[in-house]
Every structure is written in C-alpha cells, then in structure tokens.
Regions:
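Short gly/ser-rich loop at a beta-strand->alpha-helix junction or flexible surface loop bordering the NTP-binding
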Residues: 1-210, 335-363
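Surface segments flanking catalytic/ligand-binding clefts of nucleic-acid enzymes
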Residues: 192-363
Length: 363
C-alpha cells in the first residue's frame, strides 16, 4: 500500500466540472438568563449546543473528546439545553464563595449562549476573573481563578442575588486565550444572534481595552457575519472559507419567490451570482413532517429557477475527510457553472483565512 503524501498548509488543488447589551439588575422570570435579561432581544431561541470538530493540530485529548461527543452530535438540542446549562451554573454560583465575577465559559453559560467548539476552558468548576494577581494564585475549591489586570466595574453586571458576571464583550474577549479563531467567530456570532452584544461593541472593546490575544480577536471579527442564523451555519461557512471558497452570503433571501403565507424563502448560505444555495439540515428537518415537506417544496421551487441547492448534515462537518469532500463538491458545482476549473486549497490556518478576507475587502 503506497504511502500518502504529506499535505502542506495552503497547497492548492484544481477542481473542475468532471470531478466530484447590558444586563438588567432585576430578575425577569419571562426573560433571558434569570435576571441577565436584555431589553431589546426576543424571548425565544432554539439553537444547537456546539461540539468540538476535528481539525489539523488537535492533540490526542482533543480527538478523544471529539469521539466521546460524536453520538450526541446527531441529537437535536433545543433552547432547553441552554437553559439547563444556565441553571446549573447559576446554582453553582449561589453555593460558591467567589473572589471575582463569573467569566469565561461559565459566563457564556450564564448569558445562555452556545459554547464554542474546541476550547481549553472546561466546565467542571466555575471560572472567575480578578484584577489582583495575588488573588489568582489562591487555590479555590469552587472555581478556576483567572487574572485580568484591565478588569474594572465597567465590565461587570450583577444579578439581583448579587452574582457578578462579566459583560458579553469581556466574556468573548477573554475566551480568546483558550479558543481557536473559528470557535471565537462562532461564539461572537452566537452572542450577536441572541442579542447579547453587537459586532460594533465587540470591535470597540478590542480596540479600546487591554487584554491578551487581541490579534486572534481581530481575525475572528474579520470572519464574523452577524446574519448567521445558527452555529451550524457558521461552521458550514467557515469550512468553505478554510478551503479557499469565498463569496457566500449568510441567510440570503431569494428575490421573486415566497411561501404561500408571504414569508421570504431564505438559504443558509448562497452564492447569488452562480445560483448556488447551501442548507444545513439538522435532525428536525427529517423528523418533523411539516418541516420536511416545506423543505422539499422550497427546493423544488428554487431548482425550477435555476438554483442548485446542496444539503449539508453534521456528517459533512464531522471530520477533515468529510469537510474536504464537502468543499470539493461545492468547488465542482462552481466549476461546472463557470465552465472552468476552480482552485481549492487544503485547509488554511485561520490567520491566513482572515488575511485573505481583509485583502479581498480592500479590493
């Protein structure tokens, strides 16, 4: 059996058509976060909890964690999952003696936002942040204690029972130290989608505050798309970016067509110029009869208008071979529509992906 050649970062392949906002200080029982409510956000959310995805550079521990989680990836997770995480963290905060505000992955849970993929921050204990390095050296049975010298009262919100939580912008920025750029991008988009912050607030924080891993935050901001409607859509878009496939619009409303009730027909990702649409199908797309029929009708209508609609499932994002096959499929469709080969790279480091996107925006 012949040995496989070593793949180098950034190696190009050619695919042609013949190849396949602030937290309120009072508890609103009907609002978000048991008192971490934001006034201008809708009172519902149904998104998937994020799970780690296998990528180059993973350690053995990362791979084992991924394999343990694989069976759960195919289960549809509703808003209840976020509420359960929040309730567990909330109760732990009540019972613990904490030297500082809740931060990092614990604050993500308190904000009722999906956790990012591939983060080194674990949830077996609470995470808190202090400004005094002497406090960070004290062993705590209840929490991991982090030190951030830039912490002050502007960054802390309080619940009615006196629990301090880092605001959304500080939470996102401090997560950068233990999170890859793709996970940081996904976390930022989730916070924006749930109304916890805005892209401009995140950018202002990065530009005006002092903390570690600013370059990683700038890269994540470059890759961010506030129109993304779910974590899986973000993962799908970033997968294509990593293989050098650009030009996709998130949550694209197709002009000239709508459902019978007048609702716009949207695509998770779309290349409007070439009429290529990509739809992420979670388990509810096949288990819900109404949803399945609605999806089938939508795709028939789009195909009659010349669109090519590609369905994506968790399997397509589950590991690098499946991600590569998905990217090659999209590249082949583009090549067929353009009538010429399409250059496809092997997975690029996120720094290079962000740099390329910045260059394209300047053109």
């Amino acid at each position: 059996m012949s040995s496989q050649p070593v793949r180098k970062w950034g190696t190009c392949l050619e695919i042609d058509s013949h190849q396949s906002t602030g937290i309120s200080t009072s508890i609103d029982p009907n609002g978000f976060c048991h008192g971490l409510s934001t006034a201008d956000t809708p009172l519902s959310c149904v998104f998937c909890i994020l799970r780690p995805q296998p990528r180059f550079g993973w350690t053995t521990t990362n791979v084992l964690q991924y394999r343990r989680n694989m069976n759960e990836m195919y289960k549809p997770l509703m808003a209840r999952s976020l509420e359960e995480r929040q309730s567990i963290t909330w109760e732990a905060c009540r019972e613990a003696v904490l030297p500082g505000p809740v931060s990092h992955i614990s604050a993500v849970d308190m904000w009722k936002v999906e956790q990012p993929l591939q983060t080194s921050f674990v949830s077996d204990k609470l995470h808190v942040t202090v400004s005094d390095p002497r406090l960070s050296r004290l062993a705590s049975p209840d929490a991991y204690v982090h030190c951030w010298s830039g912490l002050d009262s502007r960054h802390i919100r309080y619940t009615t029972d006196g629990i301090g939580v880092l605001n959304a912008e500080a939470t996102w920025a401090l997560m950068a130290k233990g999170t890859q750029v793709d996970g940081l991008t996904e976390l930022g988009e989730s916070m924006i989608r749930h109304g916890r912050t805005t892209e401009s607030k995140l950018r202002d924080f990065v530009e005006n505050e002092t903390f570690q891993c600013k370059a990683k935050c700038y890269d994540a901001l470059t890759l961010m798309d506030s129109r993304s409607d779910s974590p899986k859509e973000t993962q799908t878009r970033l997968c294509l970016y990593s293989y050098g496939l650009w030009g996709f619009t998130s949550n694209y409303s197709v002009p000239g067509i709508s459902f019978d009730n007048g609702a716009a027909i949207t695509l998770d990702l779309a290349d409007p110029e070439l009429l290529i649409g990509i739809e992420y199908d979670g388990d509810h797309h096949r288990t819900d009869r109404t949803q399945w029929r609605r999806d089938a009708w939508k795709r028939r209508q789009l195909e009659s208008m010349g669109w090519t609609v590609v369905s994506v499932t968790q399997l397509d994002l589950s590991d690098e071979p499946h991600r590569a096959a998905f990217a090659m499929n999209i590249a082949a469709i583009r090549a067929r529509k353009l009538g010429r080969p399409i250059a496809l790279s092997t997975p690029l480091p996120w720094r290079k992906v962000a740099c390329r996107m910045r260059r394209m925006r300047r053109i």
